[in-house]
Amino acid sequence: MRRLFLLLLCLALVGGCARQPSVQEPEPEPIPAVREEAEPPSFSPERYVPPPWKGSEPQQGAPIVPQPGDTAACWDMARAGDFAPDDDCSDGELLAKWLAVEGLTLSDLEDRGCTQLVLTVAREEDGVSTLTTCYVMEDNAWHAQPGLTRMAGYTGSNGIAHDRRRNTRQSPAGLWALGSAFGLASQPAGLLLPWRDITPQSDWVCDAASPYFNTWQERDDPLITQLWDLQDAEHLEDYSVTYRYACVIEYNTPPYTVPDRGCAIFLHCSDHPTSGCIGLLEEDMVRTLLWLDPRENPYILITGHEKPR
């Protein structure tokens, strides 16, 4: 009996265990499908759009005199004696020297919002050959731009003058804004300055009696062509080498035009003295153009030694 009782007890226990709900382990979460890394969103860097080309607006009303940057009243060559000869100056010393000679300070550049400066110095040997160095304001200090220092070039064939007059073949000393670029060659890739192609109709008006004096005009515009003497204009296409690449120096341009001070003063290609412009070898001219940025409000300081008389 005892054995029978134990057997029945075991069967009851086994049956009871079988009826107990089994403890289920949680189902594993599904493994997400392996996906390739998504491409980063494509974007284009903000495209820089140069400002409009300037140089065709006529003088309105009486000219503003003197033009800002005219250093005729404040320059003093004696100040050069406080510095070493140019060839012995560092690039920084060279800038300090010729700012001082022109009666200018770094504050004069700051006041103009200028953070790019082209310094052209007429050399003592002849007053006609030049050295040109480009400077940029970075970290609250002026630095010479590598690769754009002591570039050889030329002034007008009669050197520089602080009270420049027309037909003197002199370059205007002083601090002048650099404006738009133009040329007979193709626009350099990467240029930031506004650019204008020279056409067979392009004139730079030199007629002192014209309201368009010292501006670019197209002679095929019948509405205005009669407003200047076609014989008293630079027909830009005729300057096949000089104007391959050029940049307007804003000397005596509207609203400052005084006709007897002259016109058509540019930074352009040249391997010899000019009629009054500042010349650089073409390779240096192109590299300088590509460096210039209108957002930096670039200026040129034309200074140095006058041509020996």
Each model region followed by its residue ranges:
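N-terminal, intrinsically disordered, polar/charged segments of Gram-positive cell-envelope systems
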Residues: P21-G92
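Extended catalytic/binding region for NAD+/ADP-ribose chemistry, centered on the ART fold
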Residues: G276-L280
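Positively charged n-region of N-terminal signal peptides that target proteins for export
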Residues: M1-L4
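C-terminal motif of bacterial Sec signal peptides marking the signal peptidase cleavage site
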Residues: G15-G16
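Cell wall/extracellular polymer interaction/catalysis modules
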Residues: D70, C74-T274, M285-R309
